[in-house]
Amino acid sequence: MKTLTNTTRGYWCAALGGVIWGLSGVAGQFLLSVYDASPFWLTGVRMTCAGIVFLILSLRQTRSLGIVVRHPKELITIFVYGIFGLMLNQLSYFFSISYSNAGTATVLQTLCVVMMAVLVCLQRRRLPYTREVLSVILAFIGVVLIATHGRITELVLSPRALIWGLLYAVSCVVYTLLSIKPVHKWGSVVVNAIGMLTGGIFLSFLYRPWEVMPHLDLAGWLAFFGIVLFGTCLLYTSP
């Protein structure tokens, strides 16, 4: 039996990640609409719980964790990643869902493909490849269709939904760029343990989620922990 190449494994991980992210968005929409959960509450508690799980997992990498904790410069880098990368990314995603729906938020997020393609071409000082041009065109078509429902002269999405969707796309680029060096150096588990806790605690101090706790039943808690375990811990862990 042939072993999977790194490229093939990457394709499968990307596809599986997309499916899990989509299901996480649907679960988030379920909590936001049915239980009237706040995007602030959902993001803060989600990140804090996921950070605790990552912290437990990182105990197997005590050397890396100990080195990071003892070096303020490394910690500051991960703190910035946790707040301006992870927290902004997840908060804008749930706000985008709350003002539209999970499908719309995901389609708007594809604009990050356009932004990343432009940044890569500028960084390497080259023209875009054919596949990159095709990706940009498809992303634009998808956003135009979801925003207008095919009626080009009309904007179906509310301004808030569009703004949060665009902010979500920008945050995806920021999150990706901020994560490259620390994850490569320390591993995704250690970096996300500190980053998730940083973003979750920071947002919790600002918003105080314990004061706006939604009344969740069994289905609500299953959806929430599904988001934490599958849509966060599994999704943010590199194989």
Roles of regions detected by a PLM:
Residues 1-44, 83, 154-181, 202:
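Glycine-/small-residue-enriched transmembrane alpha-helix faces in small-molecule transporters
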Residues 9-17, 65-92, 136, 159-169, ...:
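Loop-to-transmembrane-helix transition segments
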Residues 29-35, 66, 147-158, 207-221:
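Membrane-interface helix termini and inter-helical loops of multi-pass transporters
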Residues 35-88, 115-119, 138, 171-178, ...:
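Transmembrane alpha-helices of multi-pass small-molecule transport proteins
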Residues 36-38, 101, 187-188:
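A helix-boundary/kink motif common to multi-pass secondary transporters
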Residues 41-52, 90-130, 168:
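Specific alpha-helical transmembrane segments that line the substrate/conduction pathway
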Residues 106-109, 122-145, 155-162, 214-221:
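Loop-to-transmembrane alpha-helix entry segments
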Residues 236-239:
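Conserved small/polar residues in nucleotide/adenosyl-binding loops
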